């Protein structure tokens, strides 16, 4: 499907798994920050400035939206991979499982999860105010159409990135938006994912997260005047046409985790993929153990 209003917007939605793979490999599209922020379509700048993916004040973008040709890409990915290699503990798993069993509210769960996953980036306890603000950034474009929600999301994004800029400092390899994004992902996406796990202790997490994908879309921007191998009646406009991969639909269709954590292949899949799956599986196992240890209900 294509939504095209001359001089206003040009967006193409692709949900077929094989088409997504083919377009991704074609070289016709790239990550959004292939172009300078000021040159991107107006609605991209408007929306992403209120998300965890972009720091408008410092003009910084999350790693997944940077082209692989960016000079800092390899260093940033290596830093994240190194930090992810620091595993969680059994005590972390048990604590989170107990919180889920007790039906702790999302705000408290997000705070505790941030200590497990994101403390490794800042070397200190992440304040509750920051994990709360991280939950307020935009998740969908529709939310950006609500003025009060948009203003609050911009403020929340600024507060989280300001905290990360202070905590990470200028001397380390940590990137402000990469750290801020991970805090937001834990506060919003991991919290939701573990609720899903707690509600279904029998289905393996690999099947859960393809049947119910956590990320539904991935944006790309045209870098060539192309009709995408005949899919389009008219060519894309480089630097203007945005292609939205409906990776959630592709994950459900194919049961392929590389659509849950990327665009259908291991290249540039989420750095946290293995950590995330292992942690979710261990929490699921701990919850099963708690359930089996629970005394039986008295007969009536």
Q: Over which residues does each language-model region extend?
A:
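Cytochrome P450 C-terminal heme-thiolate binding region
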Residues: 13-16, 200-300
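Catalytic cores of PAPS-dependent sulfotransferases
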Residues: 15-24, 28, 69-84, 88, ...
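Cytochrome P450 catalytic-domain helical core, especially the substrate-recognition surface
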Residues: 37-126, 130-167
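N-terminal membrane-proximal hinge/A-helix region immediately C-terminal to the signal-anchor transmembrane segment
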Residues: 1-49
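Conserved aromatic-histidine-acidic binding/catalytic patches
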Residues: 11, 102-110, 148, 152, ...
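Central I-helix of cytochrome P450 enzymes
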Residues: 159-210, 272, 280
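Charged/polar, low-hydrophobicity segments characteristic of intrinsically disordered regions
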Residues: 142-163, 178, 207-224, 300
């Amino acid at each position: 499907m294509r939504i095209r209003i001359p001089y206003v917007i040009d967006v193409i939605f692709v949900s077929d798994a094989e088409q997504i793979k083919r377009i991704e490999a074609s070289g016709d599209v790239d990550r959004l920050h292939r172009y300078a922020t000021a040159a991107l379509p107006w609605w991209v700048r408007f929306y992403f400035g209120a998300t965890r993916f972009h720091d408008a004040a410092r003009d910084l973008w999350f790693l997944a939206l940077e082209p692989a040709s960016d000079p800092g890409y390899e260093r940033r990915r290596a830093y994240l991979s190194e930090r992810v290699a620091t595993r969680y503990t059994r005590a972390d798993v048990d604590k989170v499982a107990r919180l889920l069993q007790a039906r702790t509210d999302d705000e408290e769960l997000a705070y505790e999860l941030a200590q497990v996953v994101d403390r490794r980036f800042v070397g200190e306890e992440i304040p509750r105010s920051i994990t709360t603000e991280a939950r307020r950034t935009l998740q969908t474009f529709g939310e950006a159409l609500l003025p009060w929600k948009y203003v609050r999301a911009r403020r929340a994004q600024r507060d989280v990135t300001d905290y990360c800029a202070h905590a990470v400092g200028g001397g380390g390899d940590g990137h402000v938006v990469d750290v801020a994004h991970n805090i937001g992902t834990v506060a919003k996406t991991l919290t939701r994912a573990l609720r899903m796990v707690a509600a279904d202790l029998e289905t393996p997490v690999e099947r859960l997260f393809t049947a119910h994908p956590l990320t539904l879309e991935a944006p790309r921007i045209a870098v060539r005047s192309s009709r995408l191998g005949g899919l389009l009646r008219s060519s894309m406009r480089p630097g203007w046409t945005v292609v939205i991969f409906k990776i959630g639909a592709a994950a459900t269709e194919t049961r392929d985790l590389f659509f849950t954590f990327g665009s259908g292949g291991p290249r540039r899949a989420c750095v946290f993929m293995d950590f995330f799956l292992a942690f979710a599986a261990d929490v699921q196992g701990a919850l099963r153990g708690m359930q089996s240890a629970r005394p039986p209900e008295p007969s009536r």
